[in-house]
């Protein structure tokens, strides 16, 4: 019978942050022989690195080239899709079943949790009402688990999971759910995703004086999980996908493409709307990486576009051809050009020059409509003098049945103080691996362990 394991993802935790404010994590690391620094696959973003850890291969093979991409068939950009069918490589639990068909897996909020071969699933899934309301909820497998979790823990705290109010509440709910699911189902593999650090580090930056409190809050939840799992004979493995570094400003590649006459946009009732599929080129911005897809009008201008970005302040690399392949992104979903920002920059999806003409959804939390990742959704616009009153009045209008936008989100990219996505942030600022056998893993030349080694480490822990 395989040894049971729990793979716990402490998003945003880097070796530089482990210390006096994380006593439980630090003690566990000492017990396991120390903290190993992990080298992420490019891009170092949630869905890509999680999938690399679970499959043992990089994006060129598993196909998850970012948190989203432009579909060449539809010409549409889609981020944060959840179907397991998007992953094009076998994942940990299915690989383990080749050795023991009785292996079971519980996925508590890791990505691509829908339509999956996992036995138990808990994943955020809001209810979207026709009148524009977004109701906090989760999707589970089996279906009745949702009702049991809601009765025991309350509804999934969606607005504490992402947005200006994000805090430890969502991480605590996930930890509670993981404990309940493990106790009730005793899975062979338990995956747990704890997002708390991710938001504070992006919002405040890793050097902010409030970060020690965020670390203590996370450490408390990790301590509960470690105590639970070890008492149940489950071997914990701590990982994080990436570390988060300080940033000062953003680069807007779609504005550059627009100024070069390559972006297709039109004015709709005073708002400038873009059509990525019709554009000669469009950049899908994803933290510190942007995938630039070239359309009919852009393919013939590839070298010109590459040179344009290479000369842009804040852009560190423009990958194409053999360089793109060497970076592990030789996949049809990846951009024809892949941009990597400077260490202190990130990419926005913005294409408008006049904020009065931005899309109406830009000042809302709308992760599916925006054709790029937008960490400004963590901020209420500081220009709003009475933010609680502004939000409350809009919520009252919604409750009265009026279709009302919660258009209170900031648009200033300089508010964002932390980002990730690059794979060479500097030692101390990458992801971590803490596990029994981690000390025996082979290093790369820079002393880091590739994140793709996690799958085989997990299998080795299970089967010896």
Model features per residue range: what roles?
Residues 2-16, 28, 53, 96, ...:
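Beta-strand elements within well-structured catalytic alpha/beta cores of enzymes
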């Amino acid at each position: 019978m395989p040894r049971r394991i729990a793979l716990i993802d402490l998003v945003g935790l880097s070796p530089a942050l482990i210390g006096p404010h994380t006593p439980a994590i630090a003690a566990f690391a000492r017990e396991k022989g120390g903290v190993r620094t992990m080298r992420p696959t490019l891009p170092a973003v949630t869905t890509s690195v999680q999938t690399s850890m679970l499959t043992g291969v990089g994006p060129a093979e598993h196909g998850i080239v970012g948190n989203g991409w432009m579909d060449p068939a539809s010409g549409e950009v889609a981020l944060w899709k959840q179907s397991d069918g998007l992953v094009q490589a076998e994942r940990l639990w299915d690989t383990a079943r080749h050795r023991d068909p009785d292996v079971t897996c519980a996925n508590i909020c890791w990505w691509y949790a829908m339509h999956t071969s996992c036995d138990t699933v808990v994943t955020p899934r809001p209810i979207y009402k026709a009148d524009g309301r977004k109701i906090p909820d989760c999707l589970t497998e089996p279906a009745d688990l949702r009702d049991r979790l809601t009765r025991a823990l309350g509804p999934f705290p969606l607005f504490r999971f992402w947005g200006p109010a994000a805090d430890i509440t969502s991480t605590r709910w996930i930890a509670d759910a993981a404990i309940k699911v493990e106790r009730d189902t005793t899975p062979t593999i338990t995956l747990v995703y704890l997002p708390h650090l991710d938001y504070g580090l992006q919002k405040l930056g890793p050097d902010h004086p409030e970060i020690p409190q965020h670390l203590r809050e996370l450490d408390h939840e990790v301590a509960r999980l470690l105590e639970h799992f070890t008492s149940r004979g489950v071997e914990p493995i701590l990982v994080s996908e990436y570390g988060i570094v300080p940033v000062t400003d953003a680069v807007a590649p779609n504005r550059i493409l627009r100024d070069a006459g390559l972006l297709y946009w039109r004015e709709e009732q005073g708002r400038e709307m873009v059509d990525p599929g019709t554009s000669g080129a469009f950049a899908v911005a994803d933290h510190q990486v942007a995938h630039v897809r070239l359309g009919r009008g852009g393919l013939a201008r590839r070298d010109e576009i590459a040179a344009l970005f290479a000369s842009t302040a804040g852009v560190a690399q423009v990958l194409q051809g053999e360089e793109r392949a060497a970076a592990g992104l030789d996949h049809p979903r990846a951009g024809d050009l892949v941009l990597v920002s400077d260490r202190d920059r990130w990419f926005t999806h913005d294409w408008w020059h006049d904020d009065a003409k931005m899309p109406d959804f830009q000042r809302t939390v709308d992760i599916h409509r925006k054709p790029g990742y937008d960490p400004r959704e963590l901020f209420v616009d500081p220009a709003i003098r009475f933010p609680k009153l502004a939000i409350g009045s809009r919520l009252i209008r919604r409750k009265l049945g009026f279709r009302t936008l919660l258009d209170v989100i900031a648009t200033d990219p300089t508010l964002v103080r932390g980002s990730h996505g690059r794979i060479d942030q500097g030692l101390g600022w990458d992801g971590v691996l803490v596990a029994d056998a981690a000390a025996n893993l082979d290093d790369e030349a820079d002393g880091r362990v590739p994140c793709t080694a996690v799958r085989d480490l997990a299998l080795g822990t299970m089967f010896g």
